[in-house]
Amino acid sequence: MTSVHTPSVALSKYRDQHFKGSRHEQERLLRNSSTLYIGNLSFYTTEEQIHELFSRCGDIRRIVMGLDKFKKTPCGFCFVEYYARIDSEYAMRYINGTRLDDRIVRVDWDAGFVEGRQYGRGKTGGQVRDEYRQDHDLGRGGYGKMVAMGQLGAPNMRES
């Protein structure tokens, strides 16, 4: 008899629109994955801070920081891959919605990290969602689309 693993933490409605494969294959991978997408991070959150928080739920295989595809600087997301599915379920249950660097983090299932996904998919190099923000968020580190469209001048920053 075949055993089908039912996650103790439900899958979200979000699906990666760039997934290379069928919807059925993506669902299967999500149900069995030990990889999580972590969103709404501060641009200043370090890999060490993420490791400290998420290792409370189990042994971490790796953390892949999300980077601006042009500047190669952190852009507010990462992937956390555990060795065991149960540890990722603990993180979904206990860390999703908690604060890290004074931001409420979003934790969601991921079908598994593939090289290249660490780069932001937005036109300006960061995340798409940041391009639609209308405010300046110090924790996120940018003005979003308003600067890109010339609606605001770039913030005053001194170069060291």
From Swiss-Prot:
RRM domain ranges (all copies): 34-112
Protein name per the record: Nuclear cap-binding protein subunit 2
Ranges in coiled-coil conformation: none
GO CC, alphabetical: nuclear cap binding complex; nucleus
Entry-linked SUPFAM superfamilies: RNA-binding domain, RBD
Protein source organism: Culex quinquefasciatus
Subunit relationships: Component of the nuclear cap-binding complex (CBC), a heterodimer composed of Cbp80 and Cbp20 that interacts with m7GpppG-capped RNA.
Keywords: mRNA processing, mRNA splicing, Nucleus, RNA-binding, RNA-mediated gene silencing
